């Protein structure tokens, strides 16, 4: 795993885990990753997550399936280290006519586009999930 973009590595790990029907995936821990996974759990895209403290902290993410098919159809990284994507409160993205979510890092924490719209906040677009 390349550590140039740890968020993209986590997203790829989740995507690959669901393609291979894994029960859980393990990724290195960071607070930003934990906040992203909290949003995924709150929106019902994953079952649960746990923080494991072995030699170094890791996130154990339990993936969710419905009728043998993964709940997350597509998860895509938007803002990257080489090209940051920001939006203000008027230009927040709408993913799949509000059937999906955009995860946004704001000054008040990581949240979905819907919650950011309600609070009148903009920020960095981390990823799209549908």
From Swiss-Prot:
Keywords: Ribonucleoprotein, Ribosomal protein, RNA-binding, rRNA-binding. One of its GO terms (cellular component) is ribonucleoprotein complex. Signal peptide: none annotated. Transmembrane segments: none annotated. GO terms for biological process: translation. SUPFAM superfamilies: Ribosomal protein S8. One of the primary rRNA binding proteins, it binds directly to 16S rRNA central domain where it helps coordinate assembly of the platform of the 30S subunit. Part of the 30S ribosomal subunit. Contacts proteins S5 and S12. Belongs to the universal ribosomal protein uS8 family. This is Small ribosomal subunit protein uS8.
């Amino acid at each position: 795993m390349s550590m140039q973009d740890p968020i993209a590595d986590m997203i790829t790990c989740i995507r690959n885990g669901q393609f291979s029907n894994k029960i859980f995936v393990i990724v290195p821990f960071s607070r930003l990753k934990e906040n992203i996974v909290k949003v995924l759990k709150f929106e019902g895209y994953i079952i649960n997550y746990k923080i494991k403290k072995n030699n170094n902290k890791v996130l154990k993410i339990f993936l969710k399936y419905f009728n043998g098919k993964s709940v997350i159809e597509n998860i895509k990284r938007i803002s990257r280290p080489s090209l940051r994507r920001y939006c203000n409160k008027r230009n927040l993205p709408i993913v799949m006519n509000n059937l999906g979510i955009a995860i946004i890092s704001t000054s008040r924490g990581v949240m979905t586009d819907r919650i950011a719209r309600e609070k009148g906040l903009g920020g960095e677009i981390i990823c799209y999930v549908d």
